[in-house]
Regions:
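NAD(P)-dependent aldehyde/semialdehyde dehydrogenase
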Residues: 1-77, 85-96, 101-121, 126
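Short beta-strand/turn micro-motifs composed of small residues
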Residues: 80
Length: 130
């Protein structure tokens, strides 16, 4: 939708003005915006991107990532890590918001459990017949 392209562009420009950790914003068309960050900052979760915006920051350890994860983060996608290692990372750092750890490309796959909730249980009704 054209409005999404415009909102994505405006959001990228607004973030470039507000936050000093943006190194570059690259896009060849309106489908994908790549925003390179120098580091995370305390309001990183407010610097979100939508509709095809990818933010990239290089970190030395996953512990740096744990500093910005809050209850708004529900799914951790991965490439190049074992599930067990990431499970330990989430548990050891007490990352309460993370309730799904899935490979990249599977983040939108829906199962019976979604974002920590039993979908069937929440959308079903039990009728007792006596």
């Amino acid at each position: 939708e054209p409005i999404h392209y415009m909102n994505k562009y405006v959001n990228a420009c607004k973030n470039a003005i507000q936050y000093d950790n943006i190194v570059s914003i690259k896009h060849e068309n309106n489908l994908l915006f790549h925003i390179e960050l120098s580091n995370f900052h305390d309001k990183q979760q407010d610097q979100r991107g939508y509709f095809g915006t990818i933010q990239e920051v290089s970190i030395n350890t996953l512990d740096e990532l744990s500093e910005i994860i809050d209850d708004r983060c529900q799914t951790l996608t991965y490439l190049g890590f074992s599930k067990d290692y990431l499970h330990r990372f989430v548990v050891d750092n007490q990352l309460r918001g993370i309730d799904r750890i899935v490979p990249i490309g599977k983040a939108l796959d829906m199962g019976v459990i979604w974002d920590g909730y039993d979908i069937v249980g929440h959308l079903s009704r039990i009728v007792h017949i006596y």
